[in-house]
A protein has these predicted regions:
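Charged catalytic cores and adjacent phosphate/nucleic-acid-binding surfaces used
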Residues: 1-7, 11-21, 30, 52, ...
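Short, electropositive alpha-helical surface patch
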Residues: 55-63, 67
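Short His-Asn-centered micro-motif
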Residues: 43-45, 104-106, 153
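A short, structured active-site edge motif that brings together acidic residues
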Residues: 67-79
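Divalent metal-dependent hydrolysis catalytic cores, especially in the metallo-beta-lactamase
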Residues: 28-46
């Protein structure tokens, strides 16, 4: 079954970097439902623990209502060209499913797009960074490297969660993911 997932959000930042709480979870679950999507990936910068704690909290207090995939967004400096730095959203799939990696907002920071091993997807649409994504080039790169094309909100506030999403089978994420280190 395909799910509508916004796999690029910054919920910790949206709530001013406070610890996860039932009140925050209630607001996020309500936003997810109001946008007609099935779930989100939490990809705050350099903090995977917040998303993991948040997922546990949602599962405890709102079981079965939405999908939460914890992760983080990190910078990558390719060995081939350290000046072609880019950002990757790593999602830590539940139940030992491994790590699913998406190349975020291609063209930001560097206009050069280098695809390294263990990149599984690339954003073709990003609500806040769309202005520099060269969609034709991204589609071609995705085809060349067998990458999934993703759309994400890159929400840094509650109201933007779900403004972009990708319809995807969870099994497809699991099939491409690499084992967690």
């Amino acid at each position: 079954m395909k799910l509508k997932l916004d796999l690029h959000t910054h919920v910790w930042e949206a709530f001013n970097f406070v610890p996860p709480s039932v009140a925050i979870a209630e607001k996020v679950v309500a936003q997810i439902k109001s946008m007609g999507i099935d779930g989100i990936g939490i990809t705050d910068h350099h903090n995977k623990e917040w998303g993991m704690e948040f997922r546990e909290l949602v599962e405890k207090h709102f079981p079965g209502q939405v999908h939460i995939l914890p992760g983080w967004e990190i910078e990558i400096r390719p060995e081939a060209n350290p000046f072609a730095e880019y950002q990757v959203a790593e999602l830590f799939l539940p139940d030992g499913g491994g790590v699913f990696r998406t190349y975020c907002h291609p063209g930001y920071y560097s206009p050069e797009i280098l695809i390294e091993p263990d990149i599984h997807a690339i954003e073709i649409d990003n609500y806040i960074h769309n202005w520099h994504i060269r969609k034709d080039q991204v589609a071609e790169i995705a085809s060349e490297h067998d990458l999934m094309l993703m759309e994400g909100s890159d929400a840094h506030n509650l109201e933007n969660i779900g403004l972009r999403y990708t319809e995807v089978e969870l099994d497809d994420l699991y099939a491409r993911a690499v084992p967690q280190a």
